[in-house]
Amino acid sequence: MAGLTLKQQRFADEYIISGNIEQSAVKAGYSRSYARGNAHKLMANVSIKAYIDERLEVLNSE
């Protein structure tokens, strides 16, 4: 998906696997302190949310 950084894409992929916002942010490369205080902002990002929705649609159709 265009518009996402590699770190944002990693976050989204990790979130699809775990469902845990903070853990996904850390695994994607964000610092623990950022993840603790700001991971919810990643989920509010329209591009990230669209990427997650698209990936889930593909996974659910398989």
Predicted regions: what they are:
Residues 1-62:
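N-terminal, charge-rich alpha-helical recognition modules
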